[in-house]
Amino acid sequence: MERTLLNPPPSLRSPACRTTTATRIRPSSSMATMIPTPPPMRHARLVKASAAGRRELHAPPIAPPILLGLRSPAAASYGRASGGGGRRRGARVVARMGFDMFTDKAIKAIMMAQEEARRLGHHAAGSEQLLLGVIGEGTGIGAKVLRGAGLSLKAARAEVEKMAGRGPGMVPMEIKFTPAAKNVLQASQEEAHQLGHNYVGSEHLLLGLLREHGAALVVLKNFQADPSNIRSEVIRMISDTSEDHQPVSAAVGGGSSTTKIPTLLEYGTNLTKLAEEGKLDPVVGRQNQVDRVVQILGRRTKNNPCLIGEPGVGKTAIAEGLAQRIAAGNVPETIDGKTVITLDMGLLVAGTKYRGEFEERLKKLMDEVKQNGEIILFLDEVHTLVGAGAAEGAIDAANILKPALARGELQCIGATTIDEYRKHIEKDPALERRFQPVKVPEPTVDETIGILKGLRERYEIHHKVQYTDESLIAAARLSYQYISDRFLPDKAIDLVDEAGSLVRLRNAQLPDEAKELEKKLKKIMAEKSEAIRSQDFEKAGALRGEEVELKSEIMSLVDKSKEMSKAAVDSGESPGPTVTEADVQHIVSSWTGVPVEKVTVDESSRLLAMESSLHRRIVGQDEAVTAISRAIRRARVGLRDPRRPIASFIFAGPTGVGKSELAKALAAYYYGSPEAMVRLDMSEFMEKHTVAKLVGSPPGYVGYAEGGQLTEAIRRRPYAVVLFDEVEKAHPDVFNMMLQILDDGRLTDSKGRTVDFKNSLIIMTSNVGSGVIEKGGRQLGFAGDGSGDGGYGVIKNMVEEEMKRYFRPEFLNRLDEMIVFRQLTKLEVKEIAGIMLAEVTGRIGGKGIGLQVTERFKELVVEQGFDPSYGARPLRRAIMRLLEDTLTDKMLAGEICAGDSVIVDADGDGNVVVVGRRSAGLPDLKSPAFTV
């Protein structure tokens, strides 16, 4: 892109421009003559030159000199102006800047500088914004050197804002550059030219910043960063590597580099150097695996270990441990002095648009490794080699590397999961034989505790908290017990990390006084913005002063609070923020939904009163309610077997006595919601081909991608009641599937994932033996108002014998308890009637109608709804017929309206009588009315 400029005023001309008005400046390709640009300025008009395929900016006659406000620096380049356009008031002066020589990282730094200026509300970007851009770019040599000097983007931003302040807002679309910034850009080109580079990178921008005595140098000195030391470090790093070997406009894949091992360091990371600098986490344990890797690396040929293990067991940590050993000199002479470099395969493949580019990169990398002779490549996710870079007519990375791997010319450590190794590596026997597998097992809980203690210091420094030993032990044990689909030590480390974040956030809140000032500050900033919009700049200036004062007060309060906390910690009065076992338990509960926190006093009383609470919904059936309550208390206190489900029951008995209702009541009362119940109607699994729906359809069948009805429900909510209703109706193959659920608390779905049932309560209902119960009903005493315990024992034994004939012994033997439900007595049915009538009262009360029923009506309902063979369901039908249908007819006829209160009674003939409170002549009720 070319910028064509009018002749500036004499006071603003460079010495080269003052010779004559007709003089054109023709700078070299590596250096641009930068002309200061006084405000105000207009945007130039962009037209495309047809002859040379360039773009020219033809400034109108009154246009000022060059704007370096680049909308798209990556596409910009400055060239000589064409002859068109004519001259008015003198000749045009061309300032040409070779942006085609700037690397992607340098362009990114320049664009970020413009954004930093926009963020601060400034109309132009200065040298201080260029400094922020170099830091913010993050990956270039300039950013690395500045980070090493102690500058972070956040701290540098705060320093620049404190020094330069904020602008008035209303930032133009195009951010210009100050004269100082232009001098920096020119100086960066001069530095590149002096170093013999045909490109300008972020390192050259930093060298240019060090030459310009401006705001950027002031910022550096405020951070006690010595410019001479920074310059020396930049030169040293440039001699080792280069962030880009081609300018932006150069042909892809062309050119050559003058660096020692550029491809390796461009596409990889030096783990040995990171280990020497102490930037790698310590590796605890894994002695056997590291020794085995060293042993394989010492072979003459095929000296390529491949670490195979589940995700998160620490395969990458073994490579880092090897790098730490090499850095410490604690290795045999066969690999002493070698360098471990981890290769980024994604970065190696990225950008290879044309055929042959990927192969050229890979061959260049292999040549560098061979020439150096002291390089050990670490390929994380080594299975990505298979197929990497393979386009039509090309070969993939694995086939390119095979000869070198077999001859021992290339030493490589691979790491991949068991599944990926089987799918990709084992499928290619020629590739498999070149790698020597090293199995990396999941560490035990005790080994994980040791790993966490080794990492403790790193996480304490990062989160600025302290970890107790109990919290680390809890993280290892709870993650092993409750997080089933991941592996140690990864899941335990994540628990420790998130618990530290939780405690830090909890203790990082502003003081109360600072919070009030923060609210006031937000209000003032809103008023200032409104004043700027209404162009009341006098008011905006006054508000700006208040804003600065408030920010200063808030900062002083925060600093004072931090100093007090630090003083308390240093003096021993306060231990500082500490991660405890309870914090780790809280994180586990939030991840899994399983309550693992210690039982509180309120929960203890609720657990002890569980029977009475369940009896509000379940009438009778004391044995079942007691067994359920015992299982829940045992699990909550932590005395149950952690390898099995909370409990597994089978409820047997006649229909309508409360088997399914007890499971619903338990889910609503203890688990907090009726939705915390996975209910499967086993009549849906009567046929053989439907059994697979529990764990998911096999591959190739409809529904394979959806997963199983049972396994997916438990994966989403592991802490729940699982109700298998009418279990005797299921196909016999279902019981084979239940064996491992009842015994081991686990089930494998169709995709090979293990689903954990260890935090579920398994309840199965069955009508097996209901005939025996009905025949022996009078022995149970349902004809009267009591129940005979002796008769119940006889009937229970008979039902258990019936179940043994129906179910297999290996199935019944895995159940915790078989509970036989009693038939309902008339007194129990009357109590259930009160519960059902209360439900109807609540529903009609929602419509604004009060309802009372008499004792006589209640007896009528019980009389018509009592059937010992069918339980409570006939009672529900009687209430529907006698009460709900009668009230419905009255409401539709307009006899009962919202706001009325009605009494429902029964006459001597058993007919239902409904009387409204507003109607005259209420009948003389022989039985008193009561509110349900």
Curated annotation (Swiss-Prot):
Residues 99-240 form the Clp R domain. Residues 102-167 are annotated as: Repeat 1. Residues 1-48 form a transit peptide. CDD domains: AAA (cd00009), RecA-like_ClpB_Hsp104-like (cd19499). InterPro entries: AAA+_ATPase, ATPase_AAA_core, Clp_ATPase_C, Clp_N_dom_sf, Clp_R_dom, ClpA/B, ClpA/B_CS1, ClpA/B_CS2. Residues 518-553 form the UVR domain. Residues 264-511 are annotated as: I. Residues 177-240 are annotated as: Repeat 2. The keyword Lyase does not apply. One of its GO terms (molecular function) is ATP binding. Residues 1-20 are annotated as: Disordered. It is found in: Plastid, Chloroplast. Keywords: ATP-binding, Chaperone, Chloroplast, Nucleotide-binding, Plastid, Repeat, Transit peptide. GO terms for cellular component: chloroplast. Belongs to the ClpA/ClpB family. ClpC subfamily. This is Chaperone protein ClpC3, chloroplastic. The lineage of its organism: Eukaryota, Viridiplantae, Streptophyta, Embryophyta, Tracheophyta.
